[in-house]
A protein has these predicted regions:
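Bacterial N-terminal signal peptides that target proteins for export
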Residues: 4-15
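Preference for long, amphipathic alpha-helical scaffolds in soluble/luminal domains
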Residues: 2-4, 21-444
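Sec-dependent N-terminal signal peptides of Gram-negative exported proteins
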Residues: 14-22
């Protein structure tokens, strides 16, 4: 169980110019440490997002050393508001949202397709990031209905059934993998549990649903460390599965260490250190997918290596901040772990630099939902490491996403995952990515 150090907690919420002033005026620390050792968030007032895990489960970096946090604008805030209103109106009567089938990518009306767990979970995480809880927020009702939809999907699924939905060939499944429903649903439950839930019975249902998802995810791992039935770009599903298990483990849930170890090795194998390039065999030949997955999967260990070296330097154990296996061993890390951390750090640094290139960000050549997912993975990994790379990435994303938002507030894809619900939820997560950072700076 990994604890959060000092004022550092996990990310998840929203961003905009001016929100830092709101947090400056707030004197309440919205975090509490429970008997199980997990750091959770006390439900904040509406529009005061809590520090939580992000969609991809990255730890909060030390932003005070690198940035003022003000990269957003009134244009972004207006865009987020329009997007959130569109998402609210797109919710189905069953509490869910749907992406539709791969065979009917032309259907863009959200009420003309059945709700699916993957899309619903993605929207739920966007609601959480944008300042909503089960108790408070402009879209709290929508979030409660989201949670109920997903809990029922898991509870009604037999233990011996691999998937939590009978729907097949949905856009997320075909492009991101057959297991994507349970993977994103697990991530949603983990994020939700970061808040204190006063209803003991409800909390137990969420925990049981999460544990059931974890079991199904672990059973779906392939022998190479990736995940079975990976869809068009298997590396993306595997990266998301890795994230879901990592964050669940951080929440104190039981996760098989061997499964995680195999998963990280699989992701690292998608970047060739010797040639400093991505291996695209399992990313549909698209470098963006491979790089974003590798960058994300190596981010946690890369950050750990950096923290160990910086701490050893500050206490006098090391005279320089250079991340090598030798220095990690001097800092007290075992030889085996030191080599693993050094490798992860090198891969993360190299893949992040590659991921900022315009030819990589172009992805398939036009934007589909999988491009948006890849952008999000790349950006959050950059945020975790600190520095200015994430600002460069955010500027590119802001310039791109604001231009292509539809007049009704939605976004949609132009190939593969065309669903406006799926794409809008992901774009909301991207544009609101740094609100956690601004709040975390105030807590230092």
């Amino acid at each position: 169980m990994k604890h959060i150090i000092g004022k550092r907690n996990a990310l998840l919420s929203v961003s905009a110019l001016g929100i830092a002033l709101l947090f400056t005026a707030a004197s309440v620390n919205f975090k509490s440490k429970t008997g199980d050792g997990v750091v959770r968030c006390i439900n904040p007032e509406a529009n005061q997002p809590c520090i939580m895990k992000t969609f991809f489960g990255l730890e909060e970096p030390d932003w005070s050393k690198n940035s003022d946090g003000n990269v957003s604008s009134s244009l972004v805030e207006a865009s987020l508001k329009k997007g959130m209103e569109w998402i609210k109106d797109a919710q189905g009567n069953d509490g869910g949202w749907g992406a539709g089938t791969h065979a009917r990518q032309d259907i863009l009306d959200p009420h003309s397709v059945p709700s699916d767990p993957a899309t619903t979970a993605l929207v739920g995480m966007a609601l959480l990031r944008n300042g909503n809880t089960l108790q408070k927020g402009d879209y709290s009702t929508q979030l409660k209905n989201t949670n109920e939809f997903l809990m029922k999907a898991v509870e009604n699924c037999p233990d011996n059934q691999a998937y939590i939905t009978t729907l097949t060939n949905t856009q997320p499944q075909v492009k991101l993998g057959r297991n994507i429903d349970v993977i994103l649903t697990a991530q949603f439950f983990t994020n939700l549990l970061r808040y204190d839930i006063n209803d003991a019975q409800l909390k137990k249902r969420i925990e049981q649903s999460l544990d059931k998802c974890i079991t199904k995810i672990q059973k779906g791992q392939d022998v190479d460390g990736g995940w079975k039935d990976g869809g068009w770009a298997p590396v993306l599903q595997s990266a998301l599965a890795n994230n879901a298990l990592e964050t669940a483990k951080d929440m104190g849930r039981k996760v098989d260490k061997e499964v995680l170890d195999r998963s990280r090795k699989y992701q690292n194998s998608n970047f060739d250190e010797s040639s400093n390039s991505a291996v695209t065999g399992k990313s549909a030949g698209v470098m963006l997918y491979s790089l974003s997955s590798t960058t994300r999967a190596s981010a946690q260990d890369a950050r750990k290596a950096k923290d160990i070296i910086e701490k050893a330097n500050s206490n006098g154990t090391l005279s320089e901040v250079v991340i090598t296996s030798g220095n990690l061993m001097k800092a007290g890390v075992s030889a085996t772990e030191a080599k693993e951390l050094e490798t992860a750090y090198k891969i993360n640094e190299a893949s992040r630099k590659q991921a900022l290139k315009d030819e990589v960000l172009s992805g398939f050549g036009s934007n589909g939902g999988e491009e948006y997912i890849s952008y999000l993975m790349t950006g959050e990994s950059m945020m975790m490491q600190g520095g200015n790379d994430w600002k460069k990435w955010y500027d590119k994303m802001e310039n791109t996403l604001l231009k292509i938002q539809n007049n009704d507030g939605s976004w949609n894809g132009h190939h593969c995952i065309t669903s406006p619900v799926f794409c809008t939820a992901t774009c909301l997560l991207i544009l609101s990515i740094n609100k956690d950072m601004q709040f975390s700076m105030q807590l230092k």
